[in-house]
């Protein structure tokens, strides 16, 4: 919500694309919860259709097939979308499920998401990663991430065929600069072949926990397609809780949910700070006032506790903006939100030794051979953490 996106490329992606054929997808990183209590506590352990993915060496007799796991998916997971989230692979890889290629991923450091729905079956499923060297090493020569346990924060989960696909959320000043407006778009998906009704709602709570507004909307979505539900309620007294003002970082809580025949089906918790970061006359502004950016290169430590300690030390030095080299774990952005730190998000494009080479093919930005992978990395960065 407070990200300042590094202008590595200018891309206009209008919402998530419905991917009926599965494979790699691009959207905000989130896991739906079965109950409001677990959503508030970010407790994934009680979510029925959620599994930690911790692969190891996969063998067929004496032959090592690669890194992977045999995952048993019960009948209750089906009639759903089934997703895989991978992080900390450490190298490029080809993802195969039940002997079918799902995707080839060249970026060894950024999180990636996949729709496995067309590839999996009830019972045992072989999820295999064939690891290999990246074909585009030029894009990450200048960056080595902090070592962490391989596949940390990798998981599978399922969502109903009528569910939330993605969202865009911001809490911004209104045109009079007196109040706030919750600018919320909820992208819903219908995986059936025929139109289906979906009930979508939200609640928003002040930093002190007070319920400020809520709404529930019914929408009918055509078969195998997406639609967007938009909410824009006025939120009063927001200027009393401005994010970033004098170093304060109060956050509003937003809860998204869906219902089916009166029964709650999923909860997705969000946090958002009040304010809007803009470019005016070549200057970064917030609340129509210039912001002095004091930045430092920094990438997440091995865990959230160590990262929080290091971020606090940077803030004590007067740093107000963090500039990582590649997309970070979801909890990194949450920490920066809570600590009142801006983030200049960057795709995993790091080639400092070529920064002054203006010839064709010199820098990654000017190399036609790298164009497809370059744009893929920017796209992944944008969707992963744009909220």
Which residues are covered by each model-predicted region?
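Short, acidic/turn-prone active-site loops that include or flank metal/cofactor-
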Residues: 107, 347-352
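N-terminal signal peptide c-region/cleavage motif recognized by signal peptidases
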Residues: 13-14
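An active-site-proximal structural segment forming one wall of the substrate-binding cleft
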Residues: 367-387
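Secreted/periplasmic carbohydrate-active enzymes, especially glycoside hydrolases
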Residues: 1-7, 17-330, 334-343, 377
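Short beta-alpha connecting loops at secondary-structure transitions
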Residues: 139, 354-369
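Alpha-helix capping and helix-loop boundary segments enriched in small/acidic/polar residues
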Residues: 302, 323, 365-372
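Generic structural signal for helix capping and beta-alpha/helix-loop junctions
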Residues: 331, 352-354
